[in-house]
């Protein structure tokens, strides 16, 4: 088996680690999939425990950061970093450990961007915060910041890397389909940041 394939499989398996699910059980919340949107990401955890959501966000970002770091250690081609990030994010969205029902990939995207290009990560986070302060929708903020990151990647990186990131961005946006429908119907819940 090609060693790069082994790296991608490893990235998928690391990306599949459901920190939101695990942490929720550890502190006694129970199955986070039975709450709110039903996914295991930080936004849904936030509905039950705001401080735990921050830890979930950090760990979900860290796992993709680690995946990209592993890919760089064994391959100097930056394109492999984008593929490693993609597989980690796919693992987060469709975790093998939870019957392929996971999160939406936003935190792992941030983690991978921090490693690949911190400038894009800063833009991503900045636009997420600005959009959130204006609308209070985590989903819309995630979509907008993902598109901003896509614009930067397509401007500054190779065609192949841009295509890989476009696929990543489309997957993340597709994961927000239900949120988009609710926003159009004016039934999407806003997030209250008060602790």
Swiss-Prot record:
- Pathway membership: Lipid metabolism; phospholipid metabolism
Regarding the membrane, this protein is recorded as: Multi-pass membrane protein
Q: Which UniProt keywords apply?
A: Cell inner membrane, Cell membrane, Lipid biosynthesis, Lipid metabolism, Membrane, Phospholipid biosynthesis, Phospholipid metabolism, Transferase, Transmembrane, Transmembrane helix
Keyword Plastid included in the entry's annotation: no
Catalysis: reaction(s): an acyl phosphate + sn-glycerol 3-phosphate = a 1-acyl-sn-glycero-3-phosphate + phosphate
Against NCBIfam families, the record matches this protein to:
glycerol-3-phosphate 1-O-acyltransferase PlsY (TIGR00023)
Q: Which family does it belong to?
A: Belongs to the PlsY family.
Protein known as: Glycerol-3-phosphate acyltransferase
Look up and give the organism this protein is from. Answer: Ehrlichia ruminantium (strain Welgevonden)
**Organism ancestry:** Bacteria, Pseudomonadati, Pseudomonadota, Alphaproteobacteria, Rickettsiales
């Amino acid at each position: 088996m090609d060693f790069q394939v082994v790296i991608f499989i490893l990235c998928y398996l690391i990306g599949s680690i459901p920190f939101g699910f695990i942490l929720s059980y550890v502190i006694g919340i129970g199955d986070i999939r039975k709450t709110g949107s039903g996914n295991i990401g930080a936004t849904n955890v936030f509905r039950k425990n705001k401080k735990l959501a921050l830890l979930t966000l950090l760990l979900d970002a860290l796992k993709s950061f680690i995946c990209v770091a592993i890919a760089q250690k064994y391959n100097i081609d930056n394109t492999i970093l984008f593929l490693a990030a993609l597989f980690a994010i796919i693992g987060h969205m469709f975790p093998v450990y939870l019957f392929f029902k996971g999160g939406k990939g936003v935190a792992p995207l941030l983690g991978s961007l921090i490693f690949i290009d911190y400038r894009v990560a800063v833009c991503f986070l900045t636009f997420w915060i600005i959009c959130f302060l204006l609308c209070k929708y985590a989903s819309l903020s995630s979509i907008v910041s993902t598109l901003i990151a896509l614009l930067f990647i397509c401007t500054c990186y190779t065609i192949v890397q841009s295509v890989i990131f476009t696929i990543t961005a489309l997957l993340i946006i597709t994961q927000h389909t239900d949120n988009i429908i609710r926003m159009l119907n004016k039934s999407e819940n806003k997030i209250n940041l008060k602790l």
